[in-house]
Amino acid sequence: MLSAAPKPTPQNKKQSFYNKLWCMVCRIQDPDIIEDYAKGDLICRGCGVVVGDRIVDEHSEWRTFSNSESTGADPNRVGGPINPLLRDSALSTTVGKGSKDSGTLTRLQNKSALGTGDRNLLAAFKEIGRMADHMNLPQTVQDRANELFRFMDDKKSTKGRSVDGMVAAALYIACRQEHLSRTFKEIAALTNVPKKEISRCYKIMKETFASVLNLQTISSEDFTSRFCSTLKLPNDVKKGAEHVSKMAMDMGIVAGKSPISVTAASIYMVSQLSPEKRTQKQIADVSGVSEVTIRNAYKDLYAKRDQLIPSDSPYFSQVQYLPTN
């Protein structure tokens, strides 16, 4: 008994943009469904019930056939995989090669096979893939960005907007959702889209998703590990910076400061206590915040330095030697 969840309503929009499989026995929100490719069955791992059978494999044919027949026919039984993000699921026919006029027919057929909307979506998805590859982002982030852009396109919110800007903003949100946060400056540097344009498109997307997505507040810990890695700082400095930034946020010392500036200031403070010192300029180049911003945040941390550095830390004895700014 295979069933799909109903289309999103104002009550369940927050869960997903697409239909999900549902086990009528377990009746849990996210059932653990596995697929038996040999038998074509969908099985609930929780209760063992077969929730679907005779499932058609929608992936591309993976076997390679030798073209030994004189007819020259292609024995592959399917084309590309179905793309659920396209309005017609990318199902279409193609003109085979053969006569001298087939090239013209193929171009005309490809132009008419997809509607204008789907052609625009395909172009956007291709750009998302290119940017994601350039940023070394995992497939999960790319898939999430595709979903976000498709949702915006359905809402007609992409009309009159910069496609590159909307794509970059979708990647920014997708990174946050997948706990791989990137700054606007990082996205701008890697996508060649102006920072202001990304910020503007992000605000538009955030307003559109206000009733659908819960964008969690960025924490300083989201950036500490990556910044320290780029600065080639040892693990003890990274852990110390994470502790300082968390304590500063919990104590309300840096109220009103952005998590990125707090992270940068925390890394600067702990690095000054260690043999692996880094300048404010070096940290500014990596974090994307100005040296002035780092200094202002550092002043707040410096005022409470004895409380931020634990007494059992190997760096505690060096607190008195911290620079004042």
From Swiss-Prot:
Segments forming TFIIB-type zinc fingers: 19-52
Alphabetical list of SUPFAM superfamilies matching this protein: Cyclin-like, Zinc beta-ribbon
GO molecular function: RNA polymerase II complex binding; RNA polymerase II complex recruiting activity; RNA polymerase II core promoter sequence-specific DNA binding; RNA polymerase II general transcription initiation factor activity; TBP-class protein binding; zinc ion binding
Binding positions for Zn(2+) per the UniProt entry: 23, 26, 44, 47
Gene Ontology terms: cellular component: nucleus; protein-DNA complex; transcription preinitiation complex
InterPro entries to which the protein is assigned, alphabetical: Cyclin-like_dom, Cyclin-like_sf, TFIIB, TFIIB_CS, TFIIB_cyclin, Znf_TFIIB
Coiled coil segments of this chain: none
Sequence repeat start-end pairs: 131-207, 227-303
Family annotation (Gene3D superfamilies): 1.10.472.170, Cyclin-like
A Pfam cross-reference name: Zn_Ribbon_TF
Keyword Transcription regulation (UniProt): yes
Keywords: Metal-binding, Nucleus, Repeat, Transcription, Transcription regulation, Zinc, Zinc-finger
An individual GO BP term: RNA polymerase II preinitiation complex assembly
Major place of residence: nucleus
Cellular localization per UniProt: Nucleus
Similarity comment: family membership: Belongs to the TFIIB family.
Function comment: General transcription factor that plays a role in transcription initiation by RNA polymerase II (Pol II). Involved in the pre-initiation complex (PIC) formation and Pol II recruitment at promoter DNA.
Protein name listed in UniProt: Transcription initiation factor IIB
Native organism: Dictyostelium discoideum
